[in-house]
Regions:
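Short N-terminal secondary-structure initiator segments
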Residues: 1-15, 67-84
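Conserved mixed alpha/beta core segments that line enzyme active sites in large multi-domain catalysts
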Residues: 1-42, 91-194
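An N-terminal structural lobe/cap that precedes and organizes the functional/catalytic core
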Residues: 40-50, 54
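Terminal amphipathic helices with adjacent charged low-complexity linkers/tails
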Residues: 50-77
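Metal-assisted phosphate- and nucleotidyl-transfer catalytic regions
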Residues: 81-95
Length: 194
């Protein structure tokens, strides 16, 4: 992801290093297959596509937790509301904020902010529906859209530590301290209705 050259013509982009998480990796694979085999326009009157997507890799999750001193949450018993409040009031890394500012300039639709965790890579333990997804409306004000987007990203990060997520991770014999979260930002597809 290059803040100087990114445009809405880019169908799938990655911000940062580290894992894409299971969901994003699957979407990237499907996108490459659609392009490679020209399936997106192969059938008359049918358009197959993956919504324009940007993935925030796990590097930024690690940075966010470390720079805001949030690791203590792993060993504490806070309510979901307390965790969400702590995360939303924390600051995302500058480089990520700048990349998202560049991205938001190209957005003209509502957005889905989706989880894509490292544990979603598991072949034997499904994690579908465990973490949060947030929908944000399109607002014709870049600053307001950016604020909504930043809050949604932090909220997805917080969902790693919610009670239901913790319980599921423990039941799957995984460790909460080893979980890492990537975030998928996707345009919402559809037709506006009156």
């Amino acid at each position: 992801f290059d803040t100087e050259t990114y445009s809405d013509a880019v169908a799938f982009a990655r911000i940062g290093e580290g894992s894409l998480g299971g969901k994003a990796r699957g979407l990237a694979f499907m996108n490459s297959m659609l392009m490679k085999h020209r399936q997106y326009d192969k059938h008359e009157n049918v358009r197959i596509m993956i919504p324009r997507s940007v993935v925030i890799a796990t590097e930024f999750f690690d940075d966010f937790i470390r720079h805001n001193g949030l690791k203590y949450i792993i060993s504490q018993d806070f309510s979901d509301e307390e965790i969400l409040s702590e995360f939303v009031s924390s600051v995302l890394p500058f480089r990520l904020r700048e990349a998202l500012k560049s991205y938001i300039r190209t957005v003209r639709t509502p957005l889905a902010i989706r989880s894509s965790s490292k544990l979603e890579d598991s072949h034997y333990q499904p994690f579908a529906g465990i973490y949060s997804t947030y929908m944000i409306p399109y607002v014709d004000n870049e600053d307001q859209m950016l604020r909504l987007l930043l809050k949604a990203v932090k909220s997805v990060y917080a969902s790693v530590y919610f009670a239901a997520s913790r319980a599921y991770i423990q039941s799957s014999q995984n460790l909460i301290s080893e979980e890492k979260m990537a975030v998928i930002i996707q345009e919402v597809c559809g037709t506006e209705q009156d």
